Amino acid sequence: MKENSFKRNRKAMMALLLCTGFIVTQPISVMAEEIMIFAQTTQQQKQSVSGVIKDATGEPVIGASVLEKGTTNGTITDFDGRFTLNVIPGTTLIISYIGYKTVEMKTVAGQPINLTLTEDSEMLEEVVVVGYGTMRKKDLTGSVVQINPSKIADQNPTSVQDVLRGTPGLQIGYDASAKGSDASILLRGQNSLGTNASPMIVLDGMAFYGELSEINPDDIAQIDVLKDASSAAIYGAKAAAGVIIITTKKGKEGKPVINVGANLSVSRKSDYRDYFDAAGYLKFHQDWRKMYYTYGQGEDGLYDYYQAKDGSGNLLYPAGYYDDPRTLTEGEQKAWASNIGVSGIGLSEGESMLGLFARRLEFNNSPMMMENFLNGRMVDWNDATFRTGFNQDYNASISGATERVNYYFSLGYINNEGAVQGNEYNAFRSNMKINAKITDWLEVGANVNFQDRSDGDIQVSLGSNYWDNNMLRNSPYASMYDNNGNYEQYPMSGLPTNGGYNYYFDRQYYDLEKGYTVLNTIFNAKITLPAGFSYQFNIAPRYQWFYDRYWMSADLPNASAADRGVNRGWSKNFDWNLNNTITWDKIFGEHHFTAILVQEAEEHRYWSDNVNARNITPSDALGFHYTQGANKTQSGFSTNDTHYTAASYLGRLFYSFKDRYMFTGTFRRDGYSGFGSNNPWGNFGSVGLSWVFSEENFMSDAHDWMDMGKLRLSWGTNGNREFGDVYSTLSNLSLAGGSMVYYQNGNSNVVNPLYMSRLAAPNLEWEKTKAWNIGLDFSFLNGRLTANMDYYLKKTTDMIMSQRLPSFSGFGSIMANLGEVQNQGFEIALNSTNIQNRNFIWNTSVGFSINKN
């Protein structure tokens, strides 16, 4: 009786699973199968084959795929695990179901197929990437969410942010530019007000200091997001805002696999501020003048248009004075022209009704606009500002593996047009990842990522306030071109006063080349030692070159040569970080221990030079290629060199008993040269506990439909070292304006005086975030339905901010630890595999999160 009730429960769960897929809108991924038709001289007679598919407990497997090998002929099992299929005699059937090993079985005429599927332990023990290692998902004590390859492949994202979008707890902004990869990322709320609150990025096990556009989404195998302090505390000073771990693809054993893909799309502007077309522009001027000139109190005491009077009680403007004569009859037009009130204007000799209408709207203040209006010439400034951009993303890769070597190579090219005219972005990306097993105890590997990208353009200005250049504020009766067919500098009037703005005229006098060349590398070696020990060395050097060449021609009409010329700048970054990791992993009966000790160091150096050349003679016609002729007193140059370091020591202990009770503890000590001399080191740690209650005896009756149920509890503390200028805790000397005469031994010298412009902050401490998390994880029907729920509370103290000082101190502010920020919230994620067979996959994902800051 009890078994039957469980069977009914399982059927109900399956029905609910299918209904969930219909209720929630989710893209459906269809795997296309090539169909090849061969001509045959004879046709074999098909026969009916039936059978029952069950699991190890004897329960029917619902929705298992049964496929005739080498064909697209297939079916799925019903609620009793039964199937019937017409096949060629002696053919082989492929039976598969998520969470179970795939089985091939040859048919025998007249014999039913009764098959018991065995669980696929590799799928049930899904591995996630955590700090400095991996863990089974079942063993996690912290809040970790994994974005698997199927989502990446199905959605074909164009940026890392697109991959992350939709993950519960993550807030991903939108970047409407052609680049499209500068969208902000926020995990579980804003942790800090005065410092950077973005999550730490880890690429293939090493901290990543570049921008996310350098990572090709097509190269990503999986992403793991460490949300709570327990899972992220291993990264200490850089993990207060969470950690996003990106793992790139590697080859699989077998023949080389070649993938080529193209992603073509268009971009259009979203809702933007309203602009006036020709009809709207006229109505605006009519309504504005009616309100400004004619609004007044009528005989009935009410206020309305055309009620304004002079001191004698005469109407200033009669009703309909600002009406468009083209909407009136011939008789009405004559009355409209002659009835002008006290302050109105009437027809001039030889003037048309339309001309009078234009004068009443004061278009005659701009003869150019007046002429265009009378002749019906208009410009659509919206089309001149926006466009439908065409985006191209091409990728190719080759990968493979042998028993000793694993390799993956890829190339990618992006050429994007933004929705704003002139907004463009292009980039070339390549990636090489290779690992080799030199001996049974030594493995080495390298990961080299290269990118060359443009990073600037001269796009149409949209302006941020009324005084900024913005073509959308031009009249539709303004002129794009002058009478000679050249771009008009002042499209509204032809004069600087109320002249409007024409991007295309100004663009002739500007040029820009700006971009980055980046090389990210990771080199590693791993030695397997006796007694469960292993040692791994990783080092990640990073090189970045930046160039910026900007030309502003002094030939721009009405421009000052002293303010025009060439800006040339370059910079170079060299960063490296390394770690030495010792891991001990040992199982004693029902006890599982994993211990990790890590020593880490990093260094960052930055150099830049900038030249601003002005008033170049005899001409700046050579653009940014010529600066020698600049006026030295009107030009300037600057340099900036930055150097900072960090070091860390950390450890993590994981213990599991019976794969049922888990404990994780971490401790990390971080040192950073950017902090005050009295507090360069910070200590961070965490504790996490989890209980797989589904393994308890009292849950044995639920094993038929529940794969796993787990309770998680965690507490931890993380730090934040990202507070801008790495020298802000040191005092600073600056050159004062002007000069002074200095006398020594009767001799005078003219010197530039120095003064202290910044007060030292030797007592600045680490910004710390403490977090508590409680979570539940569930898996049903062999992983076909999963659920994760988390409640968290985070509190940031000793926030690093600028504190104002009284004026008598001689300084405006000092860096200090001020204030607190608290975040608390709830997250839930539901994932289901509604249908999965050889030709069709239907997955559904639902996420919900709420955060209170």
Model-derived segments and their meaning:
Residues 273, 278-362, 451-494, 601-622, ...:
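A surface-exposed, glycine/aromatic-enriched loop/edge motif typical of exported proteins
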Residues 55, 78, 310, 482, ...:
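Acidic surface patches and DE-rich sequence motifs
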Residues 1-417, 421-431, 438, 443-445, ...:
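Short, small/polar-rich motifs associated with maturation and membrane association
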Residues 152, 198, 427, 433-442, ...:
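Extracellular/periplasmic, surface-exposed regions of secreted and cell-surface proteins
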Residues 74, 84, 234, 397, ...:
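Short, surface-exposed charged micro-motifs
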